[in-house]
Amino acid sequence: MLNTLMLREWLRSMLRSCISKIFGDLMLISHISLSDKITLLTYGCNFKCKYCFFKPLSCKKYSVDEILNKILEVNENYKLDKILIAGGEPTLQNDLSELTKLLKDEGFYLMLSTNGYYLKDMLDKLEVDEIHIDLKAYDENKHIYLTSCSNKKVLDCISYIGKYRDEFNFKVEIDTVLIPNIVDLDEIEKIAKFLSNWDLPYRITGYVKYNNNLNAEKPDEDKILKAKEIALKYLSNVSCSLDFKRHKKSKKVII
């Protein structure tokens, strides 16, 4: 298992290096959507999550200046002041930090949604207001089963942010999808215990069946509330998908 993981890490590193060399100052963008905020979805991910719902069929290559101009053009009709950068996995984009700087200079409130795998190495360069890290599982074997990737770098990144939290100028939240019989109540408790070292904000979202890659069903409301109750034994700030709808209905803009 160790040799296999090392090979995977090497291949991922080589792939990321190749992407950087090929695209240079270009970013791969699928589309943007608009509701109470602009959501910019980047293309590509280093994880292969079994329950991933984001399967774009195409993307385009844009420089950060072109992306900024497109956002400003589209936003003329909406006058929104918040932008969520998600994916895919945004941290695969070579010029993410440059894009965040340009958007902040325009006065936008920036949120980044990431799996946290490559995040630690770019924390000092990003100019964002919020970072949401999706921790799939605390147990490494479960994480590998769900994503085909180890969670060691993700846990290390969360630990680093927790330790130096007061030195960063962004809010942070850790998110987990509650998946019955896989990432169940016992796993939620392990994650909550881990996060309690720094009392990081935690959000639990109920799994929604998108494909047949997981032998799992949507958790009922009682289970979601129980998961929240368990997490609150260790953390002061816990929310769940029953508390409010985070994503309002949006209009897709293909760019």
From Swiss-Prot:
PROSITE patterns: RADICAL_ACTIVATING, RADICAL_SAM. It catalyses: glycyl-[protein] + reduced [flavodoxin] + S-adenosyl-L-methionine = glycin-2-yl radical-[protein] + semiquinone [flavodoxin] + 5'-deoxyadenosine + L-methionine + H(+). It holds the Pfam family Radical_SAM. S-adenosyl-L-methionine binds at Y51, C52, F53, G88, D134, L135, K136. It is an enzyme of class 1 (oxidoreductase). SUPFAM superfamilies: Radical SAM enzymes (SSF102114). [4Fe-4S] cluster binds at C45, C49, C52. Binds 1 [4Fe-4S] cluster. The cluster is coordinated with 3 cysteines and an exchangeable S-adenosyl-L-methionine. Its cofactor is [4Fe-4S] cluster. One of its GO terms (molecular function) is oxidoreductase activity. Keywords: 4Fe-4S, Iron, Iron-sulfur, Metal-binding, Oxidoreductase, S-adenosyl-L-methionine. Gene3D superfamilies: Aldolase class I. The keyword Transmembrane helix does not apply. Its EC number is 1.97.1.-. Residues 30-245 form the Radical SAM core domain. The keyword Transcription regulation does not apply. Belongs to the organic radical-activating enzymes family. PANTHER family: GLYCYL-RADICAL ENZYME ACTIVATING ENZYME MJ1227-RELATED, RADICAL SAM DOMAIN PROTEIN. This is Putative glycyl-radical enzyme activating enzyme MJ1632.
